[in-house]
Amino acid sequence: MAGHSKFKNIMHRKGRADAARSKLFSKLSREITVAAKTGLPDPAMNPRLRLAVNNAKAESLPKDVIERAIKKSQMGDAADYSEIRYEGVAAGGVGIIVEVLTDNKNRAAANVRSYFTKMGGNMGATGSVTFNFDRVGQISYPAKAASEDDMMEAAIEAGADDVTSDMDEEGEGHTVYTAFESLNDVAAALEAKFGAASNTKIAWRPKMQVPVTGDAVATLMKLLDMLDEDDDVQAVYSNEDISDEDLAKLG
């Protein structure tokens, strides 16, 4: 569920695939439960739940797990989750936004703060980082879904604001950005043309990126790892700019 930029920036962090997959499934299930609890338990009538279910399907979350997560929202003993946003700055000046979904606010705050402190960063006040980001709708497709020109044309026709395409073999494919109010309409138009997206969400897009080089790269990536791996953390957004050469040194 991490949101920090460029697929290549996280390729070196794929070693713990099974554990990461288990955590991802847990986070997807939690989002489904919360979405169903805050609205109707019917994806057709609940836009947030529809997005959560579609994203879960794109990640191959089993159908029975999705159904259980929805049913859980209707149980009287279902946990009460709080949605919290933390903001902080890593060593080197990289801004980080951490979105949390937790049943224990004190635990979540203490953990996130400890990660920043341990890696030489600092937690900030609300708004201390988000002013460097735009709140947008984000729709992702693999490169094979369409050519760069076809995706651009379809996205513009659907009302999107911007499209980036990374068509390399290990690239991140197509990312379509919209006003967050238009996300569902644009996503529906693209799905009609290209099929289901690999991910659709409200995201934080950096207005500018901060160059990170040398030893600071490993420190930053360790911090992002720690945040990603926390069970309470649903998404992480950051505005680093790291060269392919520095990423390659991480192994």
UniProtKB/Swiss-Prot annotation:
Entry keywords, A to Z: Cytoplasm, DNA-binding, Transcription, Transcription regulation
SUPFAM superfamilies (alphabetical): YebC-like
Cellular component, GO annotation: cytosol
Major localization listed first in the record, in broad terms: cytoplasm
InterPro entries: Integrase-like_N (IPR017856), TACO1_YebC-like_2nd/3rd_dom (IPR048300), TACO1_YebC_N (IPR049083), Transcrip_reg_TACO1-like (IPR002876), Transcrip_reg_TACO1-like_dom3 (IPR026564), YebC-like (IPR029072)
Family affiliation: Belongs to the TACO1 family.
Protein name, per record: Probable transcriptional regulatory protein CCNA_03352
Lineage summary: Bacteria, Pseudomonadati, Pseudomonadota, Alphaproteobacteria, Caulobacterales
